[in-house]
């Protein structure tokens, strides 16, 4: 089965994952050890609406998606992942059945956009890392990579808000040179909803402004999460 054929498997009708039971069991199997071993804490989770939204966060570790997923008991959360991950047959099967959406990076992936829009219209949530790839290779992890407009474009077309998310601590789980994982404190900080309608100008100007504001909020939320971790260390 080729990549294009696999892209439709996670969905029934307007976007339901193929196996809800598998998703629920995966949530339990992934979230319990993550919440236990890595001492994950959520800040301001009340900012997450009950309805559809796009979560947009910084990306410095392969654990970012798993940590964010473990924080979302309210309902399904679907991630957008680079299509290169689908080269592995087992990983492709797992991602398909968990409702993950492959995206062709560097292109206007209309298939991914239509699938995401269907999920959002069905009331689900979608998570996107605007940087497009992990920032682990950057010299300075404090600097976020160049943001893509995908999250803002989707929010604009689906008429849903973006929830900026600052993730801090995941980069310490498996730092460069480490042979074994570590178990740091991880904080996930959720920001207030941002909408394209919050800005003035043309459609394009609103799109760019939404992307800039989202990235600005992600940095601020991550920095606040970092301060919280340092406070906890001081009280330990």
PLM regions and their residue ranges:
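A transmembrane-helix-recognition feature enriched in membrane-embedded lipid enzymes
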Residues: 2-47, 89-98
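A generic structural signal for well-ordered alpha-helical segments
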Residues: 33-35, 72, 94-95, 119, ...
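Short, basic, glycine/proline-bearing loop/turn elements
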Residues: 29-30, 97-103, 133-138
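A secondary-structure boundary/capping signal
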Residues: 44, 58, 81-82, 99, ...
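Flexible, charged surface loops at secondary-structure boundaries
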Residues: 47-50, 121
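Catalytic core of membrane glycerolipid acyltransferases/transacylases, capturing the structured
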Residues: 49-107
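Non-catalytic C-terminal accessory region of glycerolipid acyltransferases
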Residues: 1-18, 111-236
């Amino acid at each position: 089965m080729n990549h294009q054929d696999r892209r439709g498997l996670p969905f029934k009708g307007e976007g339901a994952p193929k196996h809800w039971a598998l998703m629920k069991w995966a949530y339990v199997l992934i979230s319990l050890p993550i919440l236990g071993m890595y001492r994950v804490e959520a800040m301001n989770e009340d900012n997450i609406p009950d309805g559809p939204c796009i979560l947009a966060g910084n990306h410095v570790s392969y654990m970012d998606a798993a940590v964010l997923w473990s924080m979302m008991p309210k309902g399904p959360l679907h991630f957008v992942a680079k299509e290169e991950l689908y080269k592995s047959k087992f990983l492709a099967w797992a991602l398909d059945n968990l409702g993950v959406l492959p995206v062709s990076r560097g292109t206007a992936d209309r298939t991914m956009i239509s699938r995401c829009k269907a999920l959002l219209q069905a009331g689900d949530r979608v998570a996107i890392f605007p940087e497009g790839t992990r920032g682990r290779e950057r010299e300075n992890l404090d600097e976020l990579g160049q943001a893509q407009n995908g999250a803002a474009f989707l929010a604009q077309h689906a008429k849903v808000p973006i929830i900026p998310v600052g993730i801090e601590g995941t980069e310490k789980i498996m730092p460069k040179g480490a042979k074994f994982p570590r178990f740091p404190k991880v904080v996930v900080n959720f920001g207030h909803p941002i909408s394209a309608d919050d800005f003035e100008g043309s459609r394009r100007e609103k799109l760019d402004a939404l992307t800039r504001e989202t990235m600005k909020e992600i940095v601020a939320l991550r920095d606040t999460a970092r301060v919280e971790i340092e406070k906890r260390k001081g009280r330990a």
